[in-house]
Amino acid sequence: AATAEFDAQSAGQSIVRGWNVKVFETETELLLREQSPSATTSSKPPAVSVKKPIERKAFFGDLHVHTTYSFDGYAFGTLATPYDAYRFARGEAIANPAGFNMQLTRPMDFYAVTDHAMFLGVVKAAADTSTQFSKNEFSAPYHGLNAPENMGAGLLSILNRLNTFSSFLSEAVMQTTSGKLDRDEVLGVVRSAWRDSIDAADQFNDPGRFTTFAAYEYTSSTADMGNLHRNVIFKGTGELPREPFSRFHSANPEDLWQWMDDLRAKGVESLAIPHNSNGSNGQMFKLADWAGDPLDEAYAAQRIRNEPIVEITQIKGTSETHPVLSSRDEWAGFEIMPYRIATSALSQMEGSYAREALLNGIALGQQGITNPYQFGFIGSSDTHSAASQNKESDFVSKLGLISSTGEQRGSLPQTGLSGEMSYLVLKALGRGNSRLR
């Protein structure tokens, strides 16, 4: 029945087109840490040499965290910076956009801020009228978006934010790709926010006690809105690229891997973590490369080298398996989000789930083809408020002002127009009929 529903919808629904326009030239020029104005080598704690433990240890953290630098995080009221995110992970209280405090009962062991590389820091810079970037015509609608008088969770505020968020990407992409919005100016904002995110990771890294990572999210999708997002995590911060590789460099994940390989040749080690393959419309683990050619040894080696981990659970659903793919598993339907990201279009099941990918990889190996799907698993939050809640009793979801109450998330009856509107907003953002708890 689920397969029939997908086929019927695919035949009858107009699919939103993705953006595959190359805007920025790919580069691997390194940003030396001493060039960063707020980085001081004297403030960094010394490296700690730790013997490999005889027994394995479990460490808990989050490698998928958004702050005020992500365009969607800022649009939904997030003011928390990467510095605030690391304070939260270490056990301090930080403010939710709705005004209440968020705090862990037990600090985390590791944390990585992974703001979207595409338009990194751009909405924040557009809204802040003290910045040079805010002076361009494009920025005017965003002026004062998160000023104190606009930080309510009422109906008008939610409608305004929905309108801002829904129009931002299409308008920003159109103006950037056409050249109407100065590309160098956009790139300048991105590079500045990237340096600040690195500095925050440096400031809070405490070897042997609390580990931070310089990181970001690569946000790509196929033409039919199949999700191909990855979080890119760097091993160190001594030398890093001047700018993160984004879909404005290429929408092809294989080009991301090549960029990572080129940086690796310069001594810069990293890994990419795919997430929400459940919304990839069969593209994340398909048995063909980006061009549609059969998988070969070079593809397998490059994917294994760059993507040793897959995120299989987060707020936008699980990516382990689906009831159609695992009919004898009574838990296969747990936290399923069956839609492509940011649409109401169903996602094809085959090629979208990790357990099936493992089986397909084993089958390839039995055919004498190197298995490209050799990976471990991780769970993350994808919070967009800088705070990763890990207790169901203290959970406020991920979208700031539009998901801060039980009514808005749909876990309590919507007794007012504001709560119902927020729930409809969540559905419009691709959460389908799922209730965010």
Where are the regions a protein language model picked out?
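Short, aromatic- and glycine-rich surface loops/edge beta-strands on solvent-exposed regions
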Residues: 2-4
